[in-house]
């Protein structure tokens, strides 16, 4: 596997131990037991992609999620087609300024470089293989406000969780714990940030522009962002749709994004498919 990247970064010493405080480091949330319908913002997101060219959205009915996404050439001829429900996971990523825990300590996500060792929940420190980004300007956010990130205020997920305002793309997955019941034990699960909207201290950030950043490790991992466990990039075909053409080409050349990529935890919501 080869990816073009900058020289390895600052992580050289041994990784700090990862604390597994199951009763304290995960938000306790009553998670749904089955995948939930994808909300309308995903349909409108793909309309935004279509407006930028090379991807076209075809809806069966006006406001319905039924439809497909088509890749097109410069003349508008279709090259491929995929059911809209299958690509509902597009753009799961961090925003610039988010602090990511590495073996050398917390680092802003935009300052991470391939070779930096990222602290993971299950496998200690793992090297960053690739990072990418996608920008949305005021025009895109004005026409499609559902592209704006979800803002999680300090402490709303538990003591010190997150440590400060954390902004994530709506589909970015956060690790939570379903409390034990009489019929089942406690279970760690991912859920999209947008599913937390409406809870106190969680809203849509009123930004006029945003830069989304992606972090690729050897596989899908739970990593620490602002003290909360959330996901690294899961490079499956659905997520690849949300990347820039240059990013898709770079990852495809290294063998990523062509086949389904397993999640490191069960997922509550549309991305469970």
Regions of interest found by a model, annotated:
Residues 110-117:
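Structural motif
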Residues 108, 127, 192-193, 265-269:
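Short, solvent-exposed coil/turn linker segments
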Residues 95-102, 119-243:
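Long beta-strand-rich cores associated with HINT superfamily self-processing modules
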